[in-house]
């Protein structure tokens, strides 16, 4: 259930984005922060589902279709990796430290998951390693990295008291 809610939120809010000039359709998408957040809070399957399905819906609505399917898989991997990273980290009592660790973990999941888009070298014609790295990966990491470092800790700080009250 949380996966469907997360994917729907990501799909709707993800439409509010803008393309970075000089890249191959890399967009600044603040809603992307929902992917590692749902991974952290609800687990591997939910994180993967939110990233994959949410990104597929965004691409379909935006008119890209399934042309960039590998980016959807990368988004799913980011949600799953966030879940794995935060599962490996023991509970942190201090609020400030927990939020810093949340930002670092979300950024690490984003950096690792986006590496899957190296498949652009085989999926799209004319993409070599240099193009992948400088035109696709780094701009996406920068845009999404800023979003996750700021918004995932903010979402987590807002969610923590609600989760405790609800017994989650």
Where are these regions (language model features)?
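Hydrophobic transmembrane alpha-helices
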Residues: 1-41, 45-46, 79-87, 152, 156, ...
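Alpha-helical transmembrane segments of multipass membrane proteins
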Residues: 11-15, 36-37, 56-60, 80, ...
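Transmembrane-helix signature of polytopic, membrane-embedded enzymes
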Residues: 45-53
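Residue-level recognition of pore/gate-forming positions within transmembrane alpha-helices
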Residues: 7-11, 55, 75, 110
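Membrane-embedded alpha-helical hairpins and interfacial helices in multi-pass inner-membrane proteins
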Residues: 18-29, 63-70, 90-168
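Hydrophobic/aromatic residues in alpha-helical transmembrane segments
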Residues: 34, 77, 81, 115-116, ...
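Helix-adjacent hinge/juxtasegments
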Residues: 55-92
């Amino acid at each position: 259930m949380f996966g469907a809610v997360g994917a729907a939120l990501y799909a709707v809010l993800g439409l509010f984005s803008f393309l970075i000039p000089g890249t191959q359709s890399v967009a600044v998408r603040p809603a992307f922060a929902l992917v590692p957040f749902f991974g952290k809070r609800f687990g591997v399957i939910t994180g993967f589902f939110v990233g994959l399905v949410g990104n597929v819906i965004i691409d379909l609505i935006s008119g890209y279709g399934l042309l960039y399917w590998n980016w959807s898989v990368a988004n799913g991997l980011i949600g799953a990796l966030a879940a794995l990273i935060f599962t490996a980290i023991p509970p942190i009592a201090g609020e400030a430290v927990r939020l810093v660790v949340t930002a670092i973990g979300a950024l690490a999941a984003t950096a690792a998951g986006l590496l899957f888009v190296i498949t652009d070298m085989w999926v799209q014609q004319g993409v070599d390693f240099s193009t992948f790295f400088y035109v696709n990966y780094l701009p996406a990491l920068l845009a999404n990295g800023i979003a996750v470092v700021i918004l995932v800790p903010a979402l987590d700080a807002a969610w923590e008291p609600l989760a405790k009250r609800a017994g989650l």
